[in-house]
Amino acid sequence: MTLEEKVGQMTQITLEVIVKKDIEGEIIRPPEIDSEKMRKALVDYHVGSVINTSGAANPLPVWQKLITTIQNTAMQETPHHIPILYGIDAIHGANYTTGATLFPQQIAQAATFNRKIVENNAAITAYEVRASAIPWNFSPVLGMGRQPLWSRFWETFGEDTYLASELGRAMIKGYQGTDLKDTTHVAACMKHYLGYSNPRTGKDRTPAAIPDRELRQYYLPPFRAAVEEGVLTTMVCSGEINGTPVHANKTILTGILKKELDFKGFAVTDWEDIIYLHTRHKVAPTMREAVKMAVNAGIDMSMVPFKYEEFADLLIDLVKSGEVSEERINDAVTRILYVKKKLGLWETPITHYEGYNKFAGDEFKKTNLEAAREAVILLKNTNSTLPLDTKQKIFVTGPTANSMVPLNGGWSYNWQGTRADEFAENEQTLLEALRDQFANVSYEPGVDYDKEISISNAKRKAASADAVVLCLGESSYCETPGNIEDLVIPEAQQKLASAMVETGKPVILILLEGRPRIVSHFADDVEVILLANLPGNMGGRAIAEIISGKINPSGKLPYTYPRFANHLVTYDHKGTQALTKTDGSPEFNPQFEFGDGMGYAAFDYTNLSLNKRILEGDETLEISVDITNQGKMEGKEAVLLFVTDHFASITPAVKQLKGFQKITLAPGETQKVSFSLKQSDLSFVNKDLKTVFEPGAFSVQIEQLKKEIQWKK
């Protein structure tokens, strides 16, 4: 390959660059390829990757035509017949394909604590993405949800490193399968490597300050697990850590990712991020220097995505001048071609939707509904208010009650998720689903998200109801448009909540939101709190079934739900992070804790057993517990194992999740659940940035059962 061809493989453009536009510069719908623009990019500049949709979701035949045209040009009109690698953000289903199955978002999938659900959802997503003729998916997000202000919090698996690592593995397994040449699977992309998810301000793409030890302890492990699972690509963090943009950080991109983790795939930038080294981060005085910095640091592919000529010309010149070695170029291109070969794109550059007859079928809808059911978290149920009798008169109010938008969130049919009501018109809003379950349902919105509409009307209607279903939360958003100044739920919604409480009727609060908006002003006054996060297209039905008692809720919180805006502490905090003002004793008082969540069945935990209380070396600690369903309904239960290190050279966390299993129990049934731990499971990163095990005393805890062990060297 010539240098120009190699640089082309490292260049990624957005579909908008090569489609036809009208006289006003708007993309023609449905989108069509502009042959002249396409040939300039693919033939003249040898561009190797195309991404994105054309503003909104496309039907299968449109995707088929677009990608067939692109691939035919790449395979027939370029010297080496190298296929294009087409990528898409299909983060909770094939969300840019009309009619596809849209699952709960990642934060809601995390609430299931169910590896199999996550894997199955990913496998169906892969199937429907390949039905769209697309072989590469920009998912999963493996950043840690430890900054609840962040506008991409809902794209994470929550705040716990172990949970994110395990569910990340499951999602990659579902996406990639065992054979990527099987055209029902896609290449996964772990993102956003590394540290992107904890900006100090809480605002997207703003700087993070994360000490190296914490970076390795909390933020690196999910990416390490993904590499072990065989993930093929990674997208790089758009922000900076400790003053250095990650796109220019050779230690993180080459030293850790490619050498220490032995990552074999390639690293792609996020949107325009090489440009931002010059225009936003101000570490590169010119665009030329920005390209040099990024490629030398270890970037293999640039999501340009518009000015591809400039990127290519600058990189070619940098190689010719010796400022970027051809060896670095060869490494990048080898990695890119490796992924294309693993996907079998030379043999099957195009997949045809006619061969995917399961697309959006009943089997996939059933899987989606089960995921949504397990994602809903019952956090409060005073006096067993739920389930409601279906003969009761229900009044429904709030901004999230009658729209598909808050059920799905961002990355749903369009970038910001604002068109879900248009594209998902055949799906049920929560209000519509409640009307299916209950005979007598009335409705008044009361407020928009942040402004009052008709609170007095809502209060009057509520007075004649048996119960109020109060639907609060957030509209859809993604990335920087979702930045907020305050976690407290908007004042208009607070006023609506107060008005409903004043009626004296039982209030069932439903929260549809992408991050934990603070509700402490009225949380103590409502009888029920159901947190659904972003449960997807089947979320309305799942919530309604839980309210009516058809389904027993089983979700658990994958993050700490704060009580106060200035007390954002994770469950695995150090004891010194939560001290009282007086004697310095621990005080951790969130609205709800990580792992909280109840059902209609009472689960009794007994007989916590250990095979040994004193262990040495590479021995295995075997832990078991008996769980009995004391209720009258079948129920699912997420069993969580926590470990506390009593003393360590680095201040230990008060507890850490080290195992979880999801089980199903019939009424009266007892199951024994077992876990195994090795020394490595109790290791941590020390002050020298080495992962070490220190012998000593530990406690293992499942629910309220706790036992202490000693582990010697």
Residue ranges and their predicted role:
Residues 1-686, 692-708, 712-713:
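Glycoside hydrolase catalytic-domain context in secreted enzymes
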